[in-house]
């Protein structure tokens, strides 16, 4: 296995009892204690919120938090037992580490990484802007995905007008700048990636149009374990 690019703090194992109101999850820890954890994922979590599944949670020592525990990952049994990242706050953090370590050769050489840079007519903020002396600026937008069909990762898993907007704004940068859509595949069992046509056909068609116009798509595979996260390289793009 590749080296960890990110290491979790000590986690606690448990069993998912239920997820409700989007932000809450009742979990029975191995000790038998039942806790309510914060669910840091507002999406539908298609296929990754089944009661009875094994989960891992982190615990905060911040006395001001209403919920001390955060649900970090869940184990699914789709094609093989696989840990799937639940915490949508992590992909951008991990991507920042990957970019700083220059682990994605497809992005070429760059000297500086800027974060949350305003751009576009629709007033977005791009996740990362890569610059270098001998290259045009490269705008990188990150999207995390956990939805799969077999070993095919899919995004989005629901209609996303915000995601559609991001594609339009990245397209508007071309060809004067480089534009990249980086899909953070938050599980290690997928070897291909495709747009989630059945969930959002408008997004899927926009992505195909953008690729034809020069948008670079990087479906990045990550292995998730209770110890940490490692980068596995690119999945094959299926358009």
From Swiss-Prot:
InterPro entries: SfsA (IPR005224), SfsA_C (IPR040452), SfsA_N (IPR041465)
GO molecular function annotation: DNA binding
Entries under NCBIfam families matching the protein: sfsA
HAMAP family per UniProt: SfsA (MF_00095)
Family: Belongs to the SfsA family.
Name under which the protein is recorded: Sugar fermentation stimulation protein homolog
